[in-house]
């Protein structure tokens, strides 16, 4: 007959790695083509003029210029543009 009690396993003890999401360059800042403006999950911000949308919804500059944020349309969508330098 065993004299040790059965030991239960903990349901905790794991954590995901940080994803470093968020706005990387703010309005009025200079940017070069290819630089990341925002890393996001889903389209919290939408791509405007001079901005590309990556596979993981990352927004990046297509041209050199200045970052500009705006709110457009009846749905009040937050849009990011790059004004060419």
Swiss-Prot record:
Gene3D superfamilies: 2.40.50.100. InterPro entries: Ribosomal_bL27, Ribosomal_bL27_CS. GO terms for cellular component: cytosolic large ribosomal subunit. GO terms for molecular function: structural constituent of ribosome. Disulfide bonds: none annotated. Belongs to the bacterial ribosomal protein bL27 family. PANTHER family: LARGE RIBOSOMAL SUBUNIT PROTEIN BL27M, RIBOSOMAL PROTEIN L27. This is Large ribosomal subunit protein bL27. It comes from Xylella fastidiosa (strain Temecula1 / ATCC 700964).
């Amino acid at each position: 007959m065993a004299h040790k009690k059965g030991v239960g396993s903990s349901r905790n003890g794991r954590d995901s790695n940080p994803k470093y999401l968020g706005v990387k360059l703010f309005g009025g800042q200079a940017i070069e083509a290819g630089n990341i403006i925002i890393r996001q999950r889903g389209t919290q911000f939408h791509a405007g003029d001079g901005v590309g949308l990556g596979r993981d919804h990352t927004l990046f500059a297509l041209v050199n210029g200045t970052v500009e944020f705006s709110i457009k349309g009846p749905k009040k969508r937050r849009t990011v543009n790059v004004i060419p330098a």
